[in-house]
Each structure stands twice: as structure tokens, then as C-alpha cells.
Amino acid sequence: MKQYLELLNDVLVHGIKKPDRTGTGTRSVFGWQMRFDLSQGFPLVTTKKLHLRSIIHELLWFLRGETNIAYLKKHQVHIWDEWADATGELGPVYGKQWRRWAGADGHEIDQIRWLVEEIKRNPDSRRLVISAWNVADLPQMALVPCHALFQFYVANGKLSCQLYQRSADIFLGVPFNIASYALLTHMLAQVTGLVVGDFVHTLGDAHLYANHVEQASVQLGRVPRPQPVLRLNQAVTDLFDFTYDDIVIEGYDPYPAIKAPVAV
């Protein structure tokens, strides 16, 4: 995961100090790209321990099209708690846009189901794009999409993914985002009869919060360990049939977790 540590170091050393929506303050750079060859191990940060249950269940929650945190809380995942209302609702966030985008004529568009079928039907398409950035729905969202748009690319039997992330909390959020979209790429490759290629992560405003600087320095002092391996249940042939137990990450040997506050 040297790509991630290079980003962390660059923002720490060269980032421009800027105010932000949360009032915390950041150091940021604009425009950064990382590339991970998914055939060479699962891109999970090893220089601090990540909460795998949260990463996996959040992705499954997105794929279920849900916008209420009840599913997450049931599985002891609390990464969205700060933004939910008293009923657990977040408004039309990722799950709604991925699975039930409201068309102009009122009918709902299942972007993810369409994507699976289109990869099978027309793998050379340049339109294998999913967007969570629904301008009309932004005012109703508890938190507007940070990872806003992603595209898939098929070549030589390999499925690659590129994510555009407009806002990137590089200490807390980005390690989760890398793992989540790498996992999604593996799952999609399996159900479409492909193997994994690259995950390309393009960042807009890549920022380190002022109260994460000390933690970032600690992390940069650690030497990365070997990447783990992802094992999916090969019996699963439908993307929407994956469960938590179908996803196993082997050989993850991280350093201890580094606590840091979430900017809300």
C-alpha cells in the first residue's frame, strides 16, 4: 500500500491549509490518483488495523439499496450513526441512487442491476458508469456523496474499476473506500465471468484533517506488511446474493488501530 502512504505523506508535507465545512481545518491537495493491481493482493491498509466488518457490511448495505442505518446497527456497524436522524434515516444517499435513481418520468432506475447485465452483454461499452451524484436529491441527503461516480472497463477478460471521489478524508475514509471498491470489483468480476484487473482511485479534494496530523505521522512511521488475499464463495453467481459469510479476507496482519475523531 505504498501508493496510499505516498498520498498521506504528500498531503502532510505539501498540503495547503484550508478551512472546511466541519470547522476542523484541513491540509489538502487537489487531484491525485492511485492504481492498484487487484491480482497482486487485496488493497487493505496494513499500517493500521481497519474494521473489516464495517467495510463489508457497508457495501452490502449499499447494494441492498437501503438508506436507513437499521441494517448497519444490527451488524454492529456505526460509521453512519452521526449523520442519521432519530429514525435512522439518511435521505436518498448511495443505496437509493445505486438501486432506485428516480427518472424524469417517475420510474426508478436500478443502476447496479443494469451494470451487471451490460458488462455481460456489451463489455466493451464506454458507458459502464454508476453515479451517486443526483443533483436534484442532494438537498435531502444527510451527507452528499464523497465517492460520487465510478466506471468499469473490460479488456483481455479483466474487469477494472475507476472511482472519482470528490472529497477524500485520507486518514479515516480513503482506506475504507479503497477496500470497498476493490471488493465490489471482485464481486462483479465473479458474477460476470471475468477476473480482476486494476482499481484506479482518482481523488478531487484529498485532505487531512488538522486533528489527524499526529495520527498520520504515526502511521507513516510503520513499514507496510504483505497484502492479504480475498476469498469469495465461488458458488455465488448473483451479485445480490452475496452475504457477509461469502466474503473472507485471509492473511490480514495489520499494526494496531489508530484512533482519530470523525469530522461531522
Swiss-Prot record:
The active site is at 146 (nucleophile). GO terms for biological process: dTMP biosynthetic process; dTTP biosynthetic process; methylation. This is Thymidylate synthase. It comes from Xylella fastidiosa (strain Temecula1 / ATCC 700964). SUPFAM superfamilies: Thymidylate synthase/dCMP hydroxymethylase. Keywords: Cytoplasm, Methyltransferase, Nucleotide biosynthesis, Transferase. It catalyses: dUMP + (6R)-5,10-methylene-5,6,7,8-tetrahydrofolate = 7,8-dihydrofolate + dTMP. GO terms for molecular function: thymidylate synthase activity.
